[in-house]
Structures are given as structure tokens and as C-alpha cells.
A protein has these predicted regions:
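Cys/His-rich short segments
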Residues: 202, 207-243
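Helicase motor core with emphasis on the C-terminal RecA-like subdomain
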Residues: 1-201, 226-230, 237-238
């Protein structure tokens, strides 16, 4: 549908001012947006992608569930992202059986149920919400202290957007990715099925992020084309492991 915007605009009697906004875009994506909308010499504003209050963690645990249980604290608003509805329900069920005030959220639930789960999380009636990426679009809960990815996302853009739901109040918050070889195998299989070359390139960037020994914050900022990137942020898994 985005690709049809220029056709629509061209049919108007007078071309209006066209403005485009996005939360996360690499230099290549920004160039593509300008081409798709046929923007001629646009005024471009790119703000910093750096969120100094966020700690970025990367872990490859032997047992993801055991590690997840260690990370979750009582009365600490936490979002756990999983890649599939089945995984969401499975993980949430295990948390509930451990006495954790948690509920799940995905697009397979009715609008009424989704609305109820959102309200329970926003008003602190539950501590943890386990969700697919269907959660969070338009949801702004400022005091989320942890965003934990139980599975590796398919691309860095998705990861950054989802992790960015932590610490919107400006207070310290943690973004932790738990990944394993199984995540890589499943994601590669799914992308290959769709014969998506661009998707595979993005997935490989995500895998590189998981395996890099450089500063995680610097890796992401570099990916989004930000300049003046610190070599050592002192606030991610890799930088702290150097100490």
C-alpha cells in the first residue's frame, strides 16, 4: 500500500507537501522511501537512535526457561517477546505455574481479550506480558523495566523497536536477548521458504549482532547509520565482559 502513495498523490490537482515519518530506518531504507514517494531534495531530519538509559544484554543460555525465571522480578513490569503464538502460550503457562502474575497476548485472541490484557498490564494488575510482535503497536507504558526476547527476531529493526518499549520514563531499563542455534535454524528456514533475499540479508545482520564481540550499542547505531559511535558504551554485555 505504501508503494501506491505516489500514484495517489500524482492524481491530485496540485501536488501537496508530502512528509514521511518512521521510527527506525537504515540509510538504505530512507533512500528507498524518498524514491518511492518521489521526493525531490527533501528536508531530512534524523534524530539519534541512542537510548542511554537502556542496557543491552545478549545471552546464549543452555536452558532459556530457567534463565527467564531468573531475570523476572516481582512487581517489575516486563515484556517477554516470542516469535510464535504457540511459544507465547507455552512460555506464559510456565510462568503462571511458577506463581508469576503473567498473561499472554497475540493476534489470535479476541479484541475484547486483548484489550483486557493490555489494561491489566498498563495498570500493573499483572507484572509480565508474554507476547508476539502484535503487542505494543500504539501501547505506551512508560515504566517497563525489562524487555526480554525469548527468541531471536528476524531483523535488527524489529528488535530495536520492540526493545525500545523499555524505559520510556527515562529511568534505567534492560533489553535482553536470549538466543540459541535453534532460533537461527528456524528463522533461516522461514526466510528461505519465502525466497526473500532482502530478508535473508537482514537476518544475517541479526545473527551477526548476536555473535559480535564489539559493543552491542555501537553495532546497532552503526547499522542505523549513526555517526560518532563510541567504541565502548560500558553498558552492554560485551563492554562489561571486557572489564
Amino acid at each position: 500500500s505504501y508503494q501506491n502513495i505516489d500514484t495517489f498523490v500524482a492524481q491530485l490537482p496540485t501536488r501537496p507537501i508530502v512528509a514521511a515519518f518512521t521510527a527506525t530506518a537504515t540509510p538504505r531504507v530512507r533512500q528507498d522511501i524518498k524514491q518511492q514517494l518521489k521526493l525531490q531534495h527533501p528536508f531530512e531530519v534524523v534524530t539519534s537512535f541512542d537510548r542511554a538509559n537502556l542496557y543491552f544484554g545478549m545471552e546464549e543460555p543452555r536452558d532459556k526457561m530457567s534463565r527467564l525465571l531468573e531475570l523476572i522480578k516481582e512487581k517489575e513490569p516486563t515484556i517477554v517477546f516470542c516469535n510464535t503464538r504457540k511459544e507465547v502460550e507455552k512460555v506464559c503457562d510456565k510462568l503462571q505455574k511458577k506463581g508469576i502474575a503473567a498473561n499472554w497476548y497475540h493476534a489470535g485472541l479476541s479484541p475484547e481479550v486483548r484489550s483486557k490484557v493490555q489494561e491489566d498490564f498498563i495498570f500493573d494488575r499483572i507484572d509480565v506480558i508474554v507476547a508476539t510482535n502484535a503487542f505494543g503497536m500504539g501501547i505506551d507504558k512508560s515504566n517497563v523495566r525489562k524487555v526480554i526476547h525469548y527468541n531471536m527476531p528476524k531483523d535488527i529493526e524489529s528488535y530495536y523497536q520492540e526493545a525500545g518499549r523499555a524505559g520510556r520514563d527515562g529511568e534505567p531499563a534492560e533489553c535482553i536477548l536470549l538466543y540459541g542455534a535453534k532460533d537461527i535454524i528456524i528463522n533461516k528456514f522461514l526466510v528461505k521458504q519465502n525466497e526473500d533475499k532482502v530478508g535473508m540479508a537482514k537476518l544475517n545482520e541479526m545473527i551477526d549482532y548476536c555473535r559480535t564481540v564489539r559493543c552491542l550499542r555501537g553495532f546497532m547505531l552503526d547499522y542505523f547509520g549513526q555517526k560518532d559511535i563510541p567504541e565502548d558504551c560500558g553498558h552492554c554485555t560485551n563492554c562489561l565482559n571486557k572489564v
